[in-house]
Amino acid sequence: MVKRGKKTKYLFVTGGVVSSLGKGLSAASIGALLENRGLEVQHLKLDPYINVDPGTMSPFQHGEVFVTDDGAETDLDLGHYERFTSAKMTRRNNYTTGRIYQNVIQRERRGEYLGKTVQVIPHITDEIKAVIREAAGGADILIVEVGGTVGDIESLPFLEAIRQMKYDVGEENAVYAHLTLVPFIAAAGELKTKPTQHSVKELREIGIQPDLLLCRSDRELPRDMKDKIALFCNVDPSAVFTALDVPSIYEVPLSLHREGLDDKLAELFNIWSRAPRLERWETIVDKVKNPRRGEVRIGIVGKYVELHESYKSLNEALVHGGIANDARVKLAFIDSTKLEEGDLSDLDKVDAILVPGGFGIRGTEGKILGVKYAREHKVPFFGICLGLQMAVIEMARNVLGLAGANSLEFDEATPHPVVTLMEGQKGVTDKGGTMRLGAYPCTLKEGTKARALYGAELVHERHRHRFEFNNDYRAQFEAAGMVFSGVNPDLGLVEMIELPGQHFVGCQFHPEFRSKPFAPHPLFAGFVKAALEHRDAQQRQPPAEVKKLAVGKNG
């Protein structure tokens, strides 16, 4: 480990040509490589949109909202950072234009700029530089990812701030990495460098000369192509790297290491570090690519299935569950709104059913049908957040006989509000940042599946919700066989449920936010194990006829 007391060094990651090139994964992979060389790494994501945070944004526009232990609703890239490194993300690891401006305006209202005209330069850029320094937290290297694409007007204050940082901290303490696209044009049969040249030209016009280029491509760039890019972009030929498309995201660190990226960074930073130890990554990639126990199909019943990024951490946590069981997890995204039309045949094609979190009434009856199918057909089931609430409503209607049972979120006139608004949420009118957010304790009941999977009595998990199970109905559910296996020790809130005799588990929290490839979350490892056992049992039996469950008011 580098000795403390040395200045933090800053790596700024920008992107050009098109969005969704993989800046977040690249930043996370670089973090993994540097951490494996014995360096302490931290991350910061700067997002150019004016929202204070992504908490109120549609998953179709933004993808998943990643929740940190301290209750921040953040960009999904922070999930990559946590999964790839040991760094803990907090609210200081993600800033938006809206949050930066909010800070500056609050200072202006308090009179801290008294007598001055508050401007983008220097006040906004100074605030950006201040949050960059704060995010470093004494780490050896802070990796700063600037969201958006170079050339976007929204990104200009952030780019100006990171331009100034090199002069503030010194050339050896700041490196600019630019991720760009080198497309292969099939009709011409060749790679094209012009988009990269124009992107770097745009960056240089802003005042930033990239120190290294990550060239995203579906094939290796030949040496002469790298030399051409280096010549036209004014970088050293040894600083042009192929960012190769790979089958698994966990192969990205290994791919970049083979390119020599971490060695080049050590040279540019003039920093000594040990050789990277990547055996763990090699093992993980081998398990992902060559599973010994074959493939298992998990059905995700949700309404955001058209954009898989909406469930990014969930998808990766299921992959981790597969790693723990030496199996490949095949995800089948099932649109809950289509289940409401009556055809449940897609559910018969999977080895387990998962109902994830979500908001709003659309698609909820389809999710309830998915729960009913799992319960009646003994298919392994896992309900997360809203998924737990759907399981409660399904059992209330179809086992307890509580006609019209529902959540107050969807029906304020329901005769049986088995899911109700949390006491602390009553009277709350603002939407942003007002839910039950962050890590809370959960006590697990002795003798339950949850306790066995965790191997502990007390756990802490991250939450993002306003509604909870209504404890007024608890005795009725227990009499019908439901086990309340996890409870918040402070407020008595139900955190976990399960049904005996099958793998039927629900949790009010989001365990996917704590899962890593090297430490799969026990609930996902247990769920995938149950799916494998169900798959094997089904293969020993003749296929059952698909049953269509009637769709009615009670699900």
Curated annotation (Swiss-Prot):
Activity regulation statement: Allosterically activated by GTP, when glutamine is the substrate; GTP has no effect on the reaction when ammonia is the substrate. The allosteric effector GTP functions by stabilizing the protein conformation that binds the tetrahedral intermediate(s) formed during glutamine hydrolysis. Inhibited by the product CTP, via allosteric rather than competitive inhibition.
A Pfam family (short name) is: GATase
- State the residue spans of region: Disordered: 535-555
Gene Ontology terms: biological process: 'de novo' CTP biosynthetic process; pyrimidine nucleobase biosynthetic process
Reactions the enzyme catalyzes: UTP + L-glutamine + ATP + H2O = CTP + L-glutamate + ADP + phosphate + 2 H(+); L-glutamine + H2O = L-glutamate + NH4(+); UTP + NH4(+) + ATP = CTP + ADP + phosphate + 2 H(+)
Positions of Mg(2+) binding: 77, 145
Q: Which parts of the sequence bind ATP?
A: 20-25, 77
Q: What is its EC number?
A: 6.3.4.2
Gene Ontology CC terms: cytosol
Chain coiled-coil ranges:
none
Where in the numbering of this chain does the Glutamine amidotransferase type-1 domain appear? 297-537
The residues that hold L-glutamine are 358, 386-389, 409, 466
Q: Which InterPro entries match?
A: Class_I_gatase-like, CTP_synthase, CTP_synthase_N, GATASE, GATase1_CTP_Synthase, P-loop_NTPase
Give UniProt keywords alphabetically: ATP-binding, Glutamine amidotransferase, Ligase, Magnesium, Metal-binding, Nucleotide-binding, Pyrimidine biosynthesis
| Pathway noted in the entry | Pyrimidine metabolism; CTP biosynthesis via de novo pathway; CTP from UDP: step 2/2
Function as written in the Swiss-Prot or TrEMBL entry: Catalyzes the ATP-dependent amination of UTP to CTP with either L-glutamine or ammonia as the source of nitrogen. Regulates intracellular CTP levels through interactions with the four ribonucleotide triphosphates.
Q: What else is known?
A: CTPSs have evolved a hybrid strategy for distinguishing between UTP and CTP. The overlapping regions of the product feedback inhibitory and substrate sites recognize a common feature in both compounds, the triphosphate moiety. To differentiate isosteric substrate and product pyrimidine rings, an additional pocket far from the expected kinase/ligase catalytic site, specifically recognizes the cytosine and ribose portions of the product inhibitor.
Q: Which family does it belong to?
A: Belongs to the CTP synthase family.
Protein name, per record: CTP synthase
Q: Which gene encodes it?
A: pyrG
